[in-house]
Amino acid sequence: MSDVNSVLRKQLLNGAAQMGVAPGERQTEQLLAYIREFEKWNKAYNLSAVRDVTQMVARHLLDSLSVVPWIARSPYPLARMIDVGTGGGLPGIPLAIMFPEKTFTLLDSNGKKTRFLFHVKTLLGLDNVTVENRRVEEFAPAGLFQGVISRAFASLQDMTEGCAGLLAPGGIYLAMKGLFPEDELVPIAGKIRLVETVKLQVAETDGERHLLILQPQEP
């Protein structure tokens, strides 16, 4: 194992442990292989403004893994999930690695980014991942999703309106946010209810992070 790989492995496992996440050996190798490919492809495909690989572990991998404890204990049956505006596969690829029993559709309109995702899916043998190169308003899935997750949407209104046609009855939106978006709840009041707010503890990150669980209001 190279010194760089050893450092990244230690950083990943220590950070994950601080958040109560314990990837197995195969999952650890897959997560590290993913971030190495992310760094390599980032040079040409501009997957992220972050260039340093240790920062990628902190700001991409650990941030994505911070929602694992909530999903693992969720009372909702999240067997079918979609990551909308996934970009380079965040949080979808790390979650697909951690939850091989669930299926994840990764949706993005950027062809360069979805080419990277097809490559990673094949390289890592992620049979539970489907990649879709489409805009959300043009995507007509064969089946609806129990969980719609994203860390990319500008607002909760954009997310819940844009993804309304993807959510199965009884399903939930999982919105990953920085500061608690108080103002974003106003435009969706009466249509969408805030089920739960989770203050995420993201290792190696000082700023606030929140996971908002949302559901359409009963008519």
Swiss-Prot record:
Which reaction is the catalytic activity of this chain? guanosine(527) in 16S rRNA + S-adenosyl-L-methionine = N(7)-methylguanosine(527) in 16S rRNA + S-adenosyl-L-homocysteine
The record's listing under SUPFAM superfamilies reads: S-adenosyl-L-methionine-dependent methyltransferases (SSF53335)
Key word Translocase present: no
Instruction: Name its cellular compartments.
Output: Cytoplasm
Q: What does this protein do?
A: Specifically methylates the N7 position of guanine in position 527 of 16S rRNA.
Recorded family membership: Belongs to the methyltransferase superfamily. RNA methyltransferase RsmG family.
Show the PANTHER family listed in the entry: S-ADENOSYL-L-METHIONINE-DEPENDENT METHYLTRANSFERASES SUPERFAMILY PROTEIN
Q: What is this protein called?
A: Ribosomal RNA small subunit methyltransferase G
The species this protein belongs to is Cellvibrio japonicus (strain Ueda107)
Q: What is the lineage of its organism?
A: Bacteria, Pseudomonadati, Pseudomonadota, Gammaproteobacteria, Cellvibrionales
Gene of origin? Answer: rsmG
